[in-house]
């Protein structure tokens, strides 16, 4: 449980866990993605759904296979519902806190980064597991957009004036 306390951000409530029937069920939120996991006396399993597809395409499947070679702890997989997910599992005997931390970091950051990239590039992919996301009001989006534009213009003006 101390591991989850270490990961938890009190303001964001990014880690939720409960103990039930000798198992720990947990969710970790990173950006737009949610990783769910189960830990018991023998094994730890974590999964984050990245996107959903109705048809398999050689383009995105090759991209994911290539990515698998660069991952150290996790791997991309396709579940029975045609969800592309990134998974990690280990036996408790091999699961040091160091390994769990870096595996969870690798899994969540890759899921959060790649969902938008893959969905944008491959039109047959659809977003999945996004019910926890809250859309910002249009007024707030405008304020943030205008702020970014003003900062970019100020930076460009500063560069141009030397």
Locate each region found by the language model:
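Generic N-terminal leader/targeting and pre-domain segments
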Residues: 1-8, 40, 79-84, 125-135
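N-terminal catalytic cores of peptidoglycan-degrading enzymes
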Residues: 1-53
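Short, internal acidic amphipathic alpha-helical interface segments
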Residues: 47-83
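Charged, amphipathic alpha-helical linkers/stalks
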Residues: 119-162
């Amino acid at each position: 449980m101390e591991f989850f306390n270490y990961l938890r951000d009190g303001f964001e409530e990014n880690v939720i866990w409960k103990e039930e029937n000798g198992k720990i069920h947990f969710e970790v939120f990173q950006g737009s993605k949610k990783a769910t996991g189960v830990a018991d006396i023998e094994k730890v399993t974590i999964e984050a759904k990245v996107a959903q597809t109705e048809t398999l395409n050689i383009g995105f499947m090759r991209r994911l296979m290539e990515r698998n070679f660069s991952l150290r702890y996790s791997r991309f997989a396709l579940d029975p519902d045609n969800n592309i997910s990134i998974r990690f599992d280990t036996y408790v005997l091999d699961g040091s806190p160091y390994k769990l931390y870096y595996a969870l970091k690798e899994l969540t950051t890759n899921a959060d980064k790649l969902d938008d990239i893959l969905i944008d590039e491959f039109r047959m992919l659809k977003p999945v597991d996004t019910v926890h996301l809250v859309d910002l009001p249009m007024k707030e989006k405008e304020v943030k957009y205008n702020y970014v534009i003003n900062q970019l213009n100020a930076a460009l003006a500063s560069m141009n004036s030397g």
